[in-house]
């Protein structure tokens, strides 16, 4: 209950540190002190204090720039709205209408994984169809969200099939090998036909189906069943998606949806003012995880490599060093916003891997997946931009909103 309320607050009510910067700028404008002016941190504090004293003495403050937090990146046209600002602004644009659909699909994905854990055949099939329907609605409402939601759904199908409670189903599937061969032939035929017809995405999707079912032929009975569950549910979701989207696609028109290398990056101070809350929470979480894994052990014992667990600790340590060096290089070559996002994504993926090899808590795995995807989305606009965008305006706008949703939840 408390976790849900906190997630709701971070998602729908919380703001950014940029509001604090705006108030600081107001007081700095009326500051009359010149002591240590221009000094970092100390000078900023004295400027604020001087402005506060001037305000107490009756000097009026400049008007608050309420529009500023939605344009936090200086020197470009990036739109940096966050959900609370969007709700206050109240303009019924696709990004606002897409927010409940985005959160709905995340909730459905979690429900799907839990139903698979309990071996609920009917529930999992219905939820797979609802995932396809939600993605179709997202495409018709706010197309920017669809690639991310497709990735979330695929991750859910992977975890659902790998954790499915198969004991209750094994007795009802006595001819899995024949089913695998049937799916292989059907998928390969559709993939070949789509490739000849120039339907690249359809060919790629069914080629993946053919590859998956081909592997299942040579797998153990349990693994074959899990791979078939993945294929079945993914096809159910895809068919549901196509039933609703095909009529829509016949009446829509798009222009040059490719990606290109961006020429702009987020100023690091502006980036931190917007995302500082979430990075602070992420840092606290990572420190807690590291403390739990090293509880009761000295730093010296970590590098005592005569035991297997110590060797794993040494490997983990050097991997973290590599992540830091790669992030530092990205910061020097491209920008520190990309460096911090990439480092966060790498560390969270590392913790996700350790969790999957260890206790395999679905709750923690789900949270780590949301963190990893959120950091990856923040890194994306620092490298690529959608073609025909005005600089990075809408690319940052739409993907930062997605990142906020994922990190908050």
Outline where the language-model segments fall:
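Membrane-interface alpha helices of multi-pass inner-membrane proteins
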Residues: 86-89, 128-141, 187-197, 326-329
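Specific aromatic-rich, kink-prone transmembrane helix
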Residues: 56, 60-73, 80-82, 98-117, ...
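Hydrophobic transmembrane alpha-helices of multi-pass, membrane-embedded glycosylation machinery
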Residues: 150-159, 207-216, 344-350, 409
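Aromatic-rich transmembrane-lumenal/periplasmic boundary elements in polytopic membrane proteins
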Residues: 2-88, 259
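Membrane-interfacial loop-to-transmembrane alpha-helix junctions, especially the N-terminal start
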Residues: 3, 119-128, 175-184, 223-240, ...
């Amino acid at each position: 209950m408390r976790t849900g309320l906190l997630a709701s607050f971070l998602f729908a009510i919380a703001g950014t540190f940029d509001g604090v910067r705006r108030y600081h700028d107001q007081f700095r404008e009326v500051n009359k002190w010149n002591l240590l002016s221009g000094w970092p941190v100390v000078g900023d504090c004295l400027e604020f204090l001087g402005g506060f004293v001037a305000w107490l003495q009756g000097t009026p403050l400049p008007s608050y720039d309420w529009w500023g937090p939605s344009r936090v990146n200086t020197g470009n046209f990036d739109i940096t709205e966050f959900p609370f600002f969007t709700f206050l602004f109240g303009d019924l644009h696709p990004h606002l209408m897409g927010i409940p659909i985005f959160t709905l699909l995340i909730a459905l994905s979690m429900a799907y994984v839990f139903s698979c854990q309990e071996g609920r055949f009917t529930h999992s099939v219905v939820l797979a169809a609802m995932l396809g329907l939600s993605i179709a609605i997202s495409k018709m409402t706010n197309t920017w969200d669809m690639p991310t939601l497709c990735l979330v759904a695929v991750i859910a199908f992977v975890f659902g099939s790998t954790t499915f409670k198969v004991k209750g189903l094994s007795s009802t599937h006595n001819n899995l090998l024949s089913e695998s061969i049937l799916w292989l032939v059907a998928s390969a035929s559709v993939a070949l036909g789509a490739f000849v017809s120039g339907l690249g995405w359809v060919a790629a999707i069914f080629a993946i189906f053919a590859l998956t079912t081909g592997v299942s032929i040579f797998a153990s009975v349990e693994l074959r069943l899990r791979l078939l569950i993945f294929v079945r549910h993914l096809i159910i979701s895809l068919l549901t998606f196509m039933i609703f989207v095909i009529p829509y696609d016949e009446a829509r028109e798009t222009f040059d949806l490719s990606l290109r290398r961006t020429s702009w990056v987020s100023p690091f101070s502006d980036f931190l003012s917007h995302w500082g809350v979430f990075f602070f929470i992420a840092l606290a979480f990572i420190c807690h995880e590291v403390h739990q894994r090293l509880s009761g052990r000295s730093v010296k014992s970590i590098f005592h490599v005569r035991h297997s667990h110590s060797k794993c600790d040494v490997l983990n340590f050097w991997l973290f060093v590599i992540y830091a060096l790669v992030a530092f290089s990205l910061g020097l070559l491209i920008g520190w916003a990309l460096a911090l996002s990439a480092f966060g994504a790498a560390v969270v993926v590392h913790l996700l891997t350790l969790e999957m090899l260890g206790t395999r808590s679905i709750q923690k795995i789900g949270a780590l997946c949301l963190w990893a995807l959120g950091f990856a989305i923040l890194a994306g606009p620092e490298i690529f931009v959608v073609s025909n965008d005005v600089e990075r305006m809408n690319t940052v706008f739409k993907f930062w909103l997605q990142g906020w949703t994922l990190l908050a939840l």
